[in-house]
Amino acid sequence: YSPDKPFFMYWAPGAAHGPHHIFKEWSEKYKDKFDGGWDEYRARVFQRQLAMGIIPEGTELTERDSTMVAWDDIPEDEKEFQLRLLDVFAGFVEHTYVQVGKLIDGMDAMGYKDNTIVIYIFGDNGSSAEGQNGSISELLAQNQIPNTISQQMAALDKIGGLDALGTNKVENMYHSGWAWAGSTPFRSTKLVAAHFGGTRNPMVISWPKRIKPDKEIRSQFLHVNDIVPTLYDIIGIQHPEIVNGFEQDQMDGKSFAQTFTNPNAENLKKTQFFDNNGSRGVYHEGWFASTFGPLRPWVSAQKGLEDWNSNEDVWQLYDLKNDFSQAHDLSAEYPEKLAELKELFLNEAKENKDFPIGAGIWLRLHPEDVITSPYTEWTFNQTTTRMPEFAAPGLGKKSNTVVIDLEVKE
């Protein structure tokens, strides 16, 4: 940093992405806090959101998907395992917040806080259901390896039991039920673009010199692609057309700087489309049309993906101005509006080179087509700790031969 020049810092911690690792003293603080299970916790969070004004008055709490398990249906001998997984996650999150606080306090101590804009986004997607039934290894879901909780608990017993959760002995990930509760009041989770439980995140902005603090939640529909246009706007610079000889893509987002001082400012964002593994949606001027797609991220080793036909998907329609949580499908009442938005989605998908729809599903069905390292042999020694997945051997569902040269002292 040079005192006479502005600075830019992008800070993205690994938290609270899986696997969830944290010191035991942090996770122990949350013991007994979630004993009611995810259904009770979701209801409790919903009431607190209403009381704090975080969600609009009249918002409805959406129902659990029929393929998601209720807390009461979890076997009693597995509940302690499921609870401990969330204790670890909660400690992980709090520890992260403390580090954020240190960062802000450091800027304050150096005299930079007053004229520094801090944009704090609490995630990059909805809560992750990739722990599925609760897991000591998040890679089980990524590699579509069938497993049972009894198998995992038996393996856990060999390395320290529940105390091993949160340590480097395992790569634990909480049950998808906790993810669903973490996305209150919305439906669904990460990897679902049809519902805001898969895409929506809180954002807080601080700029003491220019923004007078207030507690009024902004209702404008924003997307992460609006961040850069907003920074360009307040700094007073233009988006470069050419960088290092390369023509740049057009900026998709819109500035929301006008909301800093006016909670009721016009929303310049008119349209935004979404697609994730064939789950898709499109926002336009207060309406949202979406279709769930083939993948339910919380279902272990899901069957039938090869039979999916995107042309047969059923679409829903939501009026977000009056239905914050997407609780009521209005497609039957407004078929013309739905048709309009479906056509808009196709135009946006074409404009953004999104075809073919659901291309990620193909790679789940045909892992041999995933881009991998060109190497066929690796040599590791004691200095090797971790390496990028795409540079490493494919250990998921591929056969490998391992040869170990070992010297054993007698």
Protein language model features and the residues they cover:
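Active-site regions of oxyanion-processing enzymes, predominantly non-cytosolic
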Residues: Y1-E63, F92, T96, G101, ...
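Active-site rim elements
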Residues: F34-G36, L85-G91, M173, S188-V192, ...
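Short glycine/proline-rich turn/loop motifs
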Residues: M68-L85, S206-K212, K321-Q326, T383-T385
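Extracellular glycan-recognition modules
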Residues: I371-E410
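Short, solvent-exposed turn/loop segments enriched in Gly/Ser/Thr/Pro and often Arg
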Residues: M9-P19, L61-V69, Y120-S127, N133-S135, ...
